[in-house]
């Protein structure tokens, strides 16, 4: 049986991570002709507060903090290249910005 792996993990391992870490986000980074993937846990308020505070003085350190705190597993190319880490975290944060919500009176 040839099962598709994501960041070297099979479906069972990913389900176990979901149980342990909560909601997971898969990010794909296109670089040249290759697609690299990273699995993040959703950032918490604590993660976002730290990023916001750090980003006021150094935006790249803020992105690095999110990567370090939220990464679960990444393809080797992302792990070894800061540019790809930045793109992966940027996609993670953009996902939060694209999430919509609505409030209305009851």
What are these regions (language model features)?
Residues 28-106:
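Short, surface-exposed, charged amphipathic helix/loop patches that serve as local interaction elements
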């Amino acid at each position: 049986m040839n099962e598709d792996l994501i960041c070297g993990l099979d479906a069972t391992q990913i389900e176990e991570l979901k149980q342990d870490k909560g909601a997971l986000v898969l990010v794909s980074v296109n670089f040249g002709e290759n697609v690299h993937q990273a699995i993040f846990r959703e950032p918490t308020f604590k993660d976002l507060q730290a990023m916001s505070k750090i980003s006021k003085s150094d935006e790249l350190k803020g992105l690095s903090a999110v990567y370090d705190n939220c990464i679960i597993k990444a393809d080797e190319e992302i792990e070894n290249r800061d540019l790809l880490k930045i793109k992966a975290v940027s996609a993670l944060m953009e996902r939060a910005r694209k999430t919509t919500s609505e409030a209305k009176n009851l």
